[in-house]
Structures are given as structure tokens and as C-alpha cells.
UniProtKB/Swiss-Prot annotation:
Compositional bias per record (Low complexity), positions renumbered to this chain: 515-524
GO cellular component entries: membrane
Localization: Membrane
Identification of the protein by name: Putative uncharacterized transmembrane protein DDB_G0293652
Keywords linked to the UniProt accession: Membrane, Transmembrane, Transmembrane helix
Organism this protein belongs to: Dictyostelium discoideum
Membrane topology: Multi-pass membrane protein
Disordered: region residues: 337-363, 484-525
Transmembrane segments: 5-25, 588-608
Lineage top rank: taxon: Eukaryota
């Protein structure tokens, strides 16, 4: 009997909980404070529309509003009316405590801005919605949170969490039927605006086989701004941001532990981008892939504003090969296709004039690339710090590659190449037709590396050129030697004017710039007989470099010892001089070495004296035991009292 009563009570309690939950859902999740709208009454008249335009505030007070959608409200009062009133404002608020209002969905998008097809119209409508979402935690979402087919919307996500997502796009771009091309002329025709402020994206899993093409944020002709947001523990088989004919601004954000299966975290197609104060760490794949038919792969230009990086925690780290290689890999896959090979075999072989013996090989073709990496911060007050670590800029590939720009073109950049290979004009010596035709890269009268007002440091890196480009188009071209700091200047000019740097600490008069990276730098325009003007400060590098006077530096021309005497003549009239800061540093180094030497000598003498004393004492001990073996008393006295040194041996004394 008692068990039956307990079961009945349990059933009643569950029934009451269900009723309370539904009441809470109806009240808290649809509590409209302003506007006087009753969604439940309007749903029965959804086809008639409404002339209402104004402000609606939805306060979602419940902590878990499951399966709740507001697309019905938006459709009934805005979309079907095709209302162009800019006063259409919708504010959706969660609890004031950040992240406590949790919304989950398994049916429809949270914001579903769709077209009205009642009149069989496919024209994208302008409804001019201003939607603000505050303090919402979207958890375990498997449908798009925001889907847009309408235009002229401004949507702000503030203090919003996106947690534990899988299987679906978060924010999708509008369908633009009338202009769905990659035409650069439409790049500024932004149709929607999205702002993510103080948001968090974490614990995404898009690694299932069905989601190879899923990108969490995919936008077209949309302006998106991401500020003070974090991206943590995201696993995908594709890029996270995919923008086409859009604009992207990212500031004060960070990524940590991102897996994109070697895709870029951001993919841009004809989309200007500004990125500042960003920290990208513990992630595989390159950070950004910029695809633009008429522009460089990566551009740090303030003028074009294609991509600008600044304040990357003092360093910009690009850990993987740059995405232009992905294009070449796609081409290689095309080559493996039999139809492609059959249709293009003759053209490919005819284009390769250097491999006439391999005309039957299907693995060669011509490819044009509009540059590789352009780092341009010319207008910045301070040089940008950029680190390329473990990159293979040009691998040994079966391609004829035509570069229209230098691989690396830097202006006002501190560039560090750590464990990099920059290889140009690599030819295969193999006679195996199955190995592919390894041809050369043609830079179309461009330099492999072009340096303007920049610092370049090589660490365990290689710069090669099997076939010198020749002329002024050299492997490395230095545009402004007076400002560039690449190793040390080796000019031996003795006719320079007095151009002593005001910041120099040199004790000599005239002649050298006090720059840390120069030795006896002077005006070399008066002396045309200089054999070497520049050299690399290079740790374990193999390189070939030419200056604008076609002087080639080989491995034997690595920078001299900075402590070696300067060859410049110091006659008191501004000639020679050398680097003041270098001289100052040399003095400190000499004093330090001398002090260390004195300390070492003192320690050595101390050790010798102590050892000699020990040897003498041991010798005395042996003498005592040798000459006084028969006289135990005298031996004991000597052992215990000689110079108060207790060379005490119990075995001898006891015996």
C-alpha cells in the first residue's frame, strides 16, 4: 500500500512539474516588455501581416528555454510586411549574469530571416532589422543560430556564448540570387552587418564525415566585426570563418587549440580584413587564407587595407605553409585525373621547354601566382614584428610557376625566418619519368625577396637559387641600404662625409652610423670599387644574395666578426669611425673577460696551494710510520701533537 502511495505521489509531482515548466516557458521565454505584441494571438493570423514597426524587447529570464524560436515573431511582424522602416528594433536579453540563460534548439534556427515566398517572389527583401542579443548561452546547437536570406540587417551578439556545437553552420550568409559571383566590383556592396562583442566560441566538434564542408561562420556580402572574443577547443575539417565579398575586422581576440585539418582558420575571398591585437596559438593549419584574383596572397598594406596585422603580442606566428600551396595541391589532384591528363597532356609538355625528354610525362603544367607574401607596414610608426617558423615557401614541385611578385616583399617589418626553406628554380636530375618534371619558378623580372626599410634575420634557414635570375632582379634585392638592417655593412669607403649619428656612443669622429647593425657605414656613392656592401648575420644559413650593384654574396661572405678592427680610416675628418655602440659593447666585453680570467687564476692558485699542503702532510705521515715503527710512544706523540695536525690512524696506534 505504501509503495502505491509513493508511486501516485511521484506521478502527481511530475505532472505538476510539467505544468509549471510549460507555464514558466510561456511567461519567461516570451515576456515582451515593450511593444504590446502578443505572439500567441498573432500566430493564428500569420498570413495577414501587421503594420507594426517599433521596438520589441524580449527578456528571456528562464535559465533553459528549450526549443524556443522567435522566427515566428519576426516573420509575422517584419518579413511578410517587407517593412523598410529603420526603427524596427528587436532586443533579446538573457539574465544579467553572463552565460546563465541557456537556449538549446533541435528544430529551427534561432533567428530565421527568410524571404516571403507567398507571392512566388525570389527577390531578396530589405527589412532593415536591428537585432541585439545580450547574455545568451547557445548550448548544444545543431541548427543555424542565424540564417539570413533578407538584407540590410544589423545583428549584434553581445556577451554571447556558443558552446558544444556540431553538425551545422552557426551563421550563414544571405542567398544573393541576382549577384552571386566573385566579381571584385561588388566587394563594397555589403548587405548585412554582424557584430560579435565579448563572445566565446568553445568546444566545437565538426569532425564527422558528413561535415567536411561545414564552416561555422559562412558569410557573403556581409560586414562582420569580432571584438574581445575567444575561440577555444574548436575541431573542424574546414575553415572557421569563410567570407566572400565581405569585410572582416578582428581586434583583441585570441584562438587556442584550434584544429582545422590543415585548412586556414580564416578564408577570405575578395574580402578586406583588418586584424589587430590578436593571439593565435596551439593550433594547426595556417591562420589566414586570402584568395583574391587581383591581389596578393597576404597583404599588410595600409593603403589597400586588404589584410593588416598589428600588435600580435609582439610577434605574428604563421606555423604552416602558406595557403597558396593549397591551390597547387588542387592542381596536382587535377593532374591525377585521367580526363584532365588526356586533355592537357600536349599543352603541359609543350610549356616545359627545359624537359623535352619527358614529353610523355603528365605531371607538368604552368601556373601563375600573383605573389606570395607581401608584408607592407610602410606607414606605421613602428616596425611590425613577424616570425615565420618552419615554413616551406616553395617545395620541390612538378610545376612551371610564374610569380608576378616577390615571394617576400617587406616594408617596415622586423622579419625573422626560423627554420625556413625558400627555394627557387629547383630542377630534377632524375631520369625516372614517373618522378615528375621538376621545373623552375619564373619571377617575371621580380626578386625572390625584396626588402625596404626592414630587418631580416635568418635562423637555420635556406635561401637558394640554382639558376640565378640575373640583372638587378636578384635573389634578394635591397631597395634602401641606408635604412635596411640585414647583418652588417662591410663598405670600405674612405671618402665619406661626416655623418656621425647623433645617437652614437663612438669615441671617434665622424664616419659611422651608430646603428647596432652597422659597422663603419658610410656613403658609398663616391666609391664604385666596393666588392661587398652587405652581408647576412646568419646562423647556419645557406644563401645567395645580390645587391642592386649585382654583387653576389656566397657562403664565404658571411658577416665578419663584429669585434674585428674596422678597415675604415679615422683621420679626424669624418672618415671611417665605426659603430660607436659596437665599440662600447666591445669594451664591456673585454672588461668582463678580464675579470673572469683573474677569478679563474685565483681559484687555480688556491687549489694548487691546498693540494701541496695536503701532499706535505701526507708525506709527513708516511715518514712517521716509516722511521718510528719501533718506538710506539714516540710515534703516538708525533701522530697526536706534531704541529697540532691529527693524522690519527686507529689501526697503527692500537697496534
Amino acid at each position: 500500500m505504501l509503495s502505491k502511495i509513493i508511486i501516485i505521489i511521484f506521478i502527481v509531482i511530475n505532472f505538476i512539474n510539467i505544468i509549471i515548466s510549460s507555464i514558466t516557458f510561456d511567461i519567461d521565454c516570451r515576456d515582451i516588455i515593450n511593444g504590446g505584441i502578443n505572439p500567441s494571438s498573432s500566430s493564428s493570423n500569420s498570413n495577414s501581416g501587421s503594420d507594426y514597426s517599433g521596438e520589441i524587447i524580449l527578456n528571456l529570464k528562464n535559465k533553459e528555454c528549450k526549443d524556443y524560436h522567435i522566427e515566428e515573431l519576426l516573420n509575422n511582424y517584419y518579413i511578410q510586411n517587407n517593412n523598410n522602416n529603420n526603427n524596427n528594433i528587436i532586443t533579446i536579453n538573457g539574465n544579467e549574469t553572463f552565460g546563465t540563460t541557456i537556449i538549446q534548439s533541435k528544430k529551427q534556427p534561432f533567428l530565421n530571416l527568410i524571404n516571403d515566398n507567398s507571392n512566388n517572389s525570389t527577390t531578396t527583401k530589405s527589412i532593415s532589422l536591428n537585432i541585439t542579443i545580450n547574455n545568451i548561452n547557445f548550448n548544444n546547437w545543431i541548427t543555424p543560430i542565424l540564417y539570413m536570406e533578407t538584407i540590410n540587417n544589423n545583428i549584434d551578439f553581445i556577451n554571447t556564448n556558443f558552446n558544444n556545437h556540431s553538425n551545422e553552420i552557426l551563421i550563414s550568409y544571405p542567398i544573393i540570387s541576382n549577384n552571386d559571383s566573385n566579381d571584385n566590383n561588388s566587394i563594397n556592396k555589403t548587405l548585412n552587418s554582424i557584430n560579435l562583442n565579448n563572445c566565446k566560441f568553445e568546444n566545437f566538434n565538426y569532425l564527422t564525415k558528413l561535415n567536411n564542408l561545414i564552416m561555422p561562420i559562412k558569410l557573403k556580402q556581409t560586414s562582420i566585426s569580432v571584438k574581445t572574443s575567444t575561440f577555444i577547443n574548436l575541431s573542424m575539417n574546414n575553415t572557421f570563418f569563410h567570407l566572400n565579398q565581405s569585410s572582416l575586422t578582428i581586434s583583441n581576440c585570441s584562438t587556442n587549440n584550434i584544429t582545422t585539418n590543415n585548412f586556414s582558420f580564416i578564408t577570405l575571398i575578395n574580402s578586406p580584413t583588418i586584424i589587430s591585437n590578436y593571439n593565435h596559438s596551439n593550433s594547426n593549419g595556417s591562420f589566414i587564407n586570402h584568395i583574391n584574383n587581383n591581389n596578393d596572397l597576404i597583404d599588410f598594406s595600409n593603403e589597400n587595407m586588404l589584410i593588416e596585422f598589428s600588435n600580435f603580442n609582439n610577434n605574428l606566428i604563421l606555423p604552416q605553409p602558406q595557403p597558396q600551396l593549397e591551390l597547387l595541391e588542387q592542381r596536382l589532384q587535377q593532374l591525377n585525373n585521367s580526363d584532365y591528363n588526356n586533355n592537357n597532356n600536349n599543352n603541359n609538355n609543350n610549356n616545359n621547354n627545359n624537359n623535352n625528354n619527358n614529353n610523355n610525362n603528365n605531371n607538368s603544367f604552368n601556373e601563375n601566382i600573383n605573389g606570395f607574401i607581401i608584408l607592407d607596414c610602410e606607414n606605421k610608426t613602428e616596425k611590425a614584428n613577424v616570425l615565420f617558423y618552419s615554413n616551406q615557401f616553395i617545395n620541390i614541385m612538378p610545376y612551371n610557376i610564374n610569380f608576378n611578385y616577390s615571394i617576400i616583399n617587406i616594408k617596415n617589418i622586423n622579419l625573422i625566418l626560423n627554420n625556413n626553406n625558400i627555394i627557387n628554380n629547383i630542377n630534377s636530375n632524375s631520369n625516372n619519368n614517373n618522378s615528375g618534371i621538376i621545373s623552375k619558378a619564373n619571377f617575371n623580372n621580380q626578386n625572390l625577396i625584396h626588402i625596404v626599410n626592414s630587418n631580416l634575420t635568418l635562423i637555420d634557414s635556406k635561401i637558394e637559387s640554382d639558376n640565378p635570375i640575373g640583372g638587378e632582379y636578384s635573389t634578394v634585392y635591397i631597395d634602401s641600404p641606408s635604412n635596411d638592417k640585414i647583418g652588417w655593412n662591410k663598405s670600405n669607403n674612405t671618402n665619406s662625409s661626416d655623418d656621425d649619428d647623433s645617437n652614437s656612443n663612438s669615441s671617434s669622429s665622424g664616419g659611422g652610423s651608430g646603428d647596432n647593425n652597422s659597422i663603419g657605414s658610410s656613403d658609398n656613392s663616391k666609391n664604385k670599387n666596393n666588392k661587398l656592401e652587405w652581408c647576412f648575420d646568419c646562423d647556419g644559413c645557406v644563401f645567395s644574395i645580390s645587391t642592386d650593384k649585382n654583387v653576389t654574396l656566397t657562403n664565404s661572405d658571411i658577416c665578419p666578426d663584429p669585434d674585428a678592427p674596422n678597415n675604415s680610416n679615422d683621420n679626424g675628418n669624418g672618415n671611417g669611425g665605426g659603430s660607436g655602440k659596437k665599440s662600447y659593447k666591445n669594451t664591456i666585453l673585454a672588461v668582463t673577460i678580464s675579470a673572469i680570467g683573474i677569478i679563474c687564476v685565483a681559484l687555480l692558485l688556491t687549489v694548487v696551494i691546498l693540494k701541496r699542503r695536503n701532499r706535505k702532510s701526507s708525506f709527513d705521515y708516511l715518514l712517521i710510520n716509516q722511521y718510528y715503527l719501533d718506538d710506539e710512544e714516540e710515534k703516538r706523540e708525533l701522530l697526536l701533537n706534531r704541529n697540532n695536525n691529527y693524522y690519527y690512524d686507529n689501526n697503527i696506534i692500537d697496534n
